[in-house]
Each structure stands twice: as structure tokens, then as C-alpha cells.
Amino acid sequence: MPRQEHIRNFSIIAHIDHGKSTLADRILEVTGLVSDREKRDQYLDRMDLERERGITIKAQTVRIPFTSKTGRKYILNLIDTPGHVDFNYEVSRSLAACDGALLVVDASQGVEAQTLANVYLALDHDHDIIPVLNKIDLPSSDVDRVKAEIEESIGLDCTDAIAVSAKTGMNVDKVLEAIVERLPAPEGNLNAPLKALIFDSWYDSYQGVVVLFRVMDGVLRKGDRVRMFATEKSYEVIRLGVFSPDIVDVAELGAGEVGFLCANIKELGDAKVGDTITHTDRPASEPVPGFKEVQPMVFCGLYPTDAAEYEPLKASLEKLQLNDAAFSYEPETSQALGFGFRCGFLGLLHMEIIQERLEREFQVDLIATAPSVIYKVETVDGKTQDIDNPSKLPDPTRITSLYEPYVRMDIHVPNEFVGNVLKLCEEKRGIQKNMGYIAANRVVITYELPFAEIVFDFFDRLKSGTKGYASMDYEPVDYRESSLVRLDILINGEAVDALAVIVHRDKAYHYGRALALKLKRTIPRQLFEVAIQAAIGQKVIARETISAMRKNVTAKCYGGDITRKRKLLEKQKEGKRRMKRMGNVELPQEAFLAALQVGDE
């Protein structure tokens, strides 16, 4: 077992595309852990989706043996954290497992919103942070400007900041020396009762749940009986090991060390991220602080395009849930779409990733309904319910008040686009809280916005309004009372539950009009007239009509009596009337997507 003063646990904090995974790759190469033959980009991002989108979704760890200039041997544990706002809780748990962090900032771009959010999380844990300026090989890099920006916005002293190029490997050895010299060794009592923090877990079809953890106090040995604090279930440790970067089995792990265990745990819910592991016979008196249950924030309906695909979709969702405890689903039925599932996600990126994984890894064709958030409703009898599906909203006469979730958002943007951002936030019912300069030409704007307003197209419009230069980060604040209504879409008098949305009363008319027009363009023409109506309760606020396709029934009459033609036209009219009464309109997938794109026009 290595001595504690020779261990360093660190993570790398960075905004998307600032070179975090590339720096991790170079560290593995410089220390000789990955040979040239095994070399590949984004070595730690094992999922195809992670490599394609260039983001880290799951936390990974790697144990790196390192010999410093002085000849002392160290063990460096790199804990790779997700960088995206949706996975904030996972980031905070990964950071709790570390004792220090490298802050990687792109020297050509400067500080971005998500960098700041994660830095604040690291500062909450009292971490020492080493600033690293990456991409100095680019002609557009400006090291002095970015140093000033970091000092201004975060208050970190950048006199000892290390300028590197992760791509070429320049100065990466200096980063390793700095980790050893400037980051603290882990604290922890080897003789105290076992206390280990779970910061990630995933499901393996052969070994059950694999748990990644950091030992805070005590020693964990193979064969020990352990208990989880949150679930109070006990298990026997059947395998103990570390990733270096491939699996290496070990007999024991002591305070300050990071590793994984397998203990025949059947469900991911039994090894929750943030939970504490302790011994059954000599338990710790209290868990590692900071554990919380992860709650989904965004919901949407997922339906198979073909009813026969329902069972395969259910099996795919079960498999996904094994590897993603934050993802939840329950069966639901829609009159328009048949049987499907109501799924809950941490945020928009999480939702996109799950949908993409279903279509890519499990080959399931999906229809996804418009995303919605959780509203709180107070009814006349004094009860409060949570509504995650617009079609479940009670009758307006039974509602006393409706509450919607608000988020606080920080937007980092260059000077010249401030007007566009302010206009967009005002349009989305935002309340401006703060605005300040972090550098000569970069502004941070803080707004409080209804979460429902950013679920649709906010991010796309923010990017297009700022030529892609803006970055944003948000966190939930609270629930506030709002004047909200449910907008129903009726096709030939029949309400389509999958197209119902909850909108603010002031926007209902505009939204209903735009959606009806969009549907008119996407629903194919039928042999009979199709009426599309947007309604609030009994009141229709917008209507569009798709005219019927017309067959010329009088073409075969050459000359002859007008009554003959009239008779044929009357017969056609009667047939169309009957068809309209009996006929069903098949809604294409584009019709459901139309609801997502209403704001584009």
C-alpha cells in the first residue's frame, strides 16, 4: 500500500473543447502508461458518443505511477469529470473524491461559463487549483490576456500558471511536477472505521454493478462485508482493483486511494453516486457529507414508431437505466401514439444523449414528444400535485394556483452581442439580476428565467444570436406562481394529447397560431377537409384548414345536362362528408417535431 504523502488525487476542470481529454491523453503518454501502439484520441472517453461529441459523460479514473525530478515515486489518481451543466451533481461528487484540480483554459478563447461553474464547485471543496493555459501552439492564443481574465473572474493567482500545448505535448512534464509539488496529499486515518465515497457506478453484465470509490478513512480489503449508508444493504467485496488504465486487481486499498469494487450488486440504485461505503461489523458514525438523490428536471414521451417495437423499447430503456441512475421512465398511453414511456432526464443534453443512444445502440425508431418540466399545481381542495405531462393538468376550474420552476443562468458573451442576449432573455420572460465585465470585451449576464422557456430552443437561439461565442450555465432556483394555461391541439375536433403544451397566458395566442400553421404545412392533404384548431379549454384561439384533395368527377361528362354534373358533384360532396365523419388523420413524425420548432420563425 503506498504511503499517503506519495498519493495525489486530482481532476481536470475545463469547458467543452478546451482540451481536457487531450491533456489527459498526453499525461498518460508522458508517464509511459499508454504505449504508442495503444494510443488514440480521448483515451478515457470509452463511449462512441463521448468521442463523437467531444464530451465526457461518465466519470473515469486512472492510476498513474510517476517518478518526479527528485527521484521520488508517486501515485497520481486522475479522476476525469463530466464538464457539462446537466451532470453537475456527478461533477461535485467526483470533485469531492479529489484533493486538488487542474483548471484548463483555452488560451485563445478565455474563461467560459461552465469552467466557472465547475471552479466554484471545486472551491466549495476547498481545493487547491493549478491554472493551466492550453493551446498555446495556436496563433490566436493570448496567454497574458487569459491570465488576467482568470485573475479577474475567479480570483486565482496566475503568476505560476503553466502554459502548455496538450496537442504537441509541450510543457506537460511541468504539469506533472506541479501536481506533485503544489497539490496536497490526501488526509485520512488508516486506523479509523472504513469510510469510502462512491463517485460513479455502472452496470457490467458479468459482474453486476461496478462501483468507483475513494477511500476517505480506514482500509478496504477483498472479502470484507460492506454496507451502503443510503440503502443500508450489505454486500461482500468479491473483487477490488484499480484502473491503470486497464484493470489491475489489488488485495486492499487504504485511505486516500481510488479504485473500484464488485460485490454482486444487482441494481445501480443500490450503489448511488455520492453514497458512503462502510464496514458492516465496524461502521463509521456518519457518512461523507453532500449526498443527495438526483431528481429528473426535464420530461418527454418516447413512443415506438411501430406498436410491435414496444417490448424492444422497454428492454432498451431497462438496459440504459442500469447504466444511468439519473434517468427514469414509466409506461404511459397516448390516444394519438399508443403505448410508450414518460421519461425523465437531468437536462437537455442528457435527453438528447439518451435518445441518440436508443437509436444508435439499440436500433429503436422513436417518436419523441415536446419536452416539459415539472409544474406544481394547487387544487381547490388544498392539495399540491406535481405535473410532468401537460395532458395530466387538472380542469382549470379546480386549480387555485400554478407554479413553474425558475433557474438562475450565467451567460458569458463578447461585448458586441450583449443586445441580442438581453433581447432573447426578455423575450423568454427573464428577470435580469446582474451584468458585469470580466475582461475588456467579455460580459457576464445573470438572469432568472422560467425553466420551461429554455427547454425548447433557447440554446440554439443563443448560439445563433452570438455567432456561437456565448456560453451558458444554469442552476435551479425555486418555484414561482405564474399565469399558465394548457394549450390543446384539435384535429377535426379530436384533441391530440401528445401535442398539448403548457404555456404562459400572454404567449398562448402567438404560440397556438404558429403551431397550427406549422402543422398545416406538415400534415399531408387528405381526401377530406382537415381542421386544425388550437384551444384553451373550450375557447378556440387559432384555426387552420387543410383543403381536401379534389378529384374531377365531371370529367367524363361531355356536354349534356347540367343536372347530371350537379348530381355527380352532390354525390362526391356526400361521400366526403361521410369520410370526414369516419376518417382518421395519420399524423407524421414531423407533426410532433413541429411543436419543438415553433420558436424558429
Swiss-Prot record:
Its main location: membrane. It is an enzyme of class 3 (hydrolase). InterPro entries: EF-4, EFG_II, EFG_III/V, EFG_V-like, EFTu-like_2, G_TR_CS, LepA_C_sf, LepA_CTD. It comes from the Bacteria. It is found in: Cell inner membrane. This is Elongation factor 4. One of its GO terms (biological process) is positive regulation of translation. Residues 5-187 form the tr-type G domain. GTP binds at residues 17-22, 134-137. It is a peripheral membrane protein. SMART domains: EFG_C. It catalyses: GTP + H2O = GDP + phosphate + H(+). Keywords: Cell inner membrane, Cell membrane, GTP-binding, Hydrolase, Membrane, Nucleotide-binding, Protein biosynthesis. Belongs to the TRAFAC class translation factor GTPase superfamily. Classic translation factor GTPase family. LepA subfamily. NCBIfam families: lepA (TIGR01393), small_GTP (TIGR00231). GO terms for cellular component: plasma membrane. PROSITE patterns: G_TR_1, G_TR_2. It comes from Nitratidesulfovibrio vulgaris (strain ATCC 29579 / DSM 644 / CCUG 34227 / NCIMB 8303 / VKM B-1760 / Hildenborough). Its EC number is 3.6.5.n1. One of its GO terms (molecular function) is ribosome binding.
